Amino acid sequence: MVGYSLALGFPLGVSGGILEGLQRFYLMNWTNIVGTLARAVLIIYVLRHGLGLLSVALITVTLPLITAAVRAMIAQRLLTIPYGWKYVDRGSLRQVANYGSVTFMIIVAARMRFKSDAVIIGSFLSAAAITHFSIGARLVDYAGEVVSSLAQIFTPMSSHFHATGDFKQLRRIFITGNRACALVMFPMTVALIIMGKSVIEAWMGARYVITSYPVLLILLIPSTIYQAQSTSNRMLFGMSLHKALAYVALMEGVSNVALSIFLVRPLGIVGDAIGTAIPLACTALFFLPRHMCRQLGISIREFVYECYFYPAVLTAPMIAVLILMQHRFYAHRYPQLVLNLAAGIAAYGVGVGWYVLTRESFGIQLKDRFSRFVSGQVGPAEQ
């Protein structure tokens, strides 16, 4: 089943790229939402009726293919693309091959970065240790996946403006996009740092906290720095300037494996986490911001201030609220965990609302429209 899924997934995946290139993100989102909900409902149905893991696997493999097929039909309707060997252009094929080979290098490097840990830990420690490592690492992955999904839209946008030579818009995407990524990533980081022990206890049990929480902290900080620059990453793909990123990512992946092997014996799973964190931090701190700022003609100081000053400041109320809630009502189970997180999110939401309405142009315009609407309603009533 997995083999058939891979074989069909490659050609069907082109349709998703077409929709992204056309900037029809709402179609991508709706197909994702419907496909995910359908998969969840079917899996629950199968498990409740005792149909076995094979049925679950069939649903898990089939639903993404159906979603991709629906996207292919939508893309065909939008573009009415003709098919045939006479439409194959060698120059375009060469361009796609060059772009794809560099992208493949980055994919391989990403697998070395995040997927090699289980092999190393299983080889040098034990299979049981993989579970303790994976709990902390998976929480970091969940947070990063949210931001990565958000940043997907910047690839076709940056490709469009780079093709037209509009560097002013590219700089605007660079600043506002990374700021948006930080506004999403920073509160998740704060929540995991302060409430990570409670999350692990409620999710997996108290016995995993002492081993998994240090892994979470070690991986979370460099991952936050990297994910807060997700727009930079996607823009490099959009502008087809990701070759340097590919070489750096490969060096990072090799360094990750080497350091993890070197440190896993004396330090255990913490050593493996350190071996992953150090190369990732170097990429996020020393390569990615400098490379992007050089490409777009922006100073590092301007980049850091414009993208990260307000997102960092706005987390202060959330930090205070979460620390207070954890001190007064420490969360051991999901209900209290949700309550504490809701209080922290509410505090952060107030700050973000203030920022949007006073600092962002569309928020200021929205506030002005609302003020005019209210004054227009009050005026006639008073008359």
What are these regions (language model features)?
Residues 4-32, 51-54, 75, 220-251, ...:
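Membrane-interface junctions at transmembrane-helix termini in multi-pass inner-membrane proteins
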Residues 29-78, 99, 250-258, 269-291, ...:
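Hydrophobic alpha-helical transmembrane segments
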Residues 298-300, 322-383:
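Membrane-proximal transmembrane or re-entrant/amphipathic helices at the cytosolic face
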